[in-house]
Regions:
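Conserved SAM-binding loop
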Residues: 101
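Short catalytic/ligand-gating loop segments at beta-alpha or beta-beta junctions
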Residues: 151-157
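N-terminal beta1-alpha1 cap of cysteine-dependent amidohydrolase-like domains
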Residues: 1-98, 106-107, 111-114, 118-146, ...
């Protein structure tokens, strides 16, 4: 994408349901940027970066499977996020995928998801999120911006199974 002028305020688009994106909005508001939460994929064309946030599970049909443990699927949101991702990729707009957003990116590039991990691998609890460490891969673009080891919250019962084409793992837990 072309260089942004000094007078231009960076615009970040969060493609998600406003009722479920408050934590993401609060985090990104710490940046000198305009934050727009929307369900309109076309908003992406005028932004500087697309954020695909966490949420429920991806509809398994999108990666060629029947439901074998996926919960809280939102097929309408999945479709909108895939459309926004297509627009961003075509326009050369950077994309950040967080939790489910990362899985959306993986599926869009032909990857698959483990729909329900074994209990000994879970990053969730009936009483709420679990906190655990993640490790940034040292040859990733983000390595220079973030600590190697980060503590994150999660409520995962899914994970990437087969990595999508042309994708690279940059953080592991």
């Amino acid at each position: 994408k072309n260089e942004v002028s000094e007078n231009h305020m960076t615009k970040l688009v969060i493609l998600g349901r406003k009722s479920k994106t408050g934590n993401y909005e609060a985090f990104f508001r710490a940046l000198p940027a305009q934050i727009v939460t929307t369900l309109v994929p076309g908003e992406v064309i005028s932004c500087d970066a697309l954020i695909l946030p966490g949420g429920g599970d991806i509809t398994p049909a999108f990666f060629g499977e029947k439901n074998k443990g996926s919960r809280t699927v939102d097929t309408e949101l999945d479709i909108l996020q895939f459309q926004a991702l297509d627009i961003a990729i075509a326009a050369g707009i950077p994309v950040i995928g967080i939790c489910k957003g990362m899985q959306v990116i993986n599926v869009a590039f032909g990857g698959t998801i483990t729909q329900d991990m074994p209990e000994d691998c879970l990053h969730s609890s009936p009483s709420g999120d679990v906190f655990h460490d993640t490790i940034m891969v040292d040859d990733s673009h983000l390595f220079k911006y973030f600590p190697v080891k980060m503590r994150v919250n999660s409520a995962h019962h899914q994970r990437i199974d087969r990595l999508g084409q042309h994708l690279k793992i940059i953080q592991v837990c």
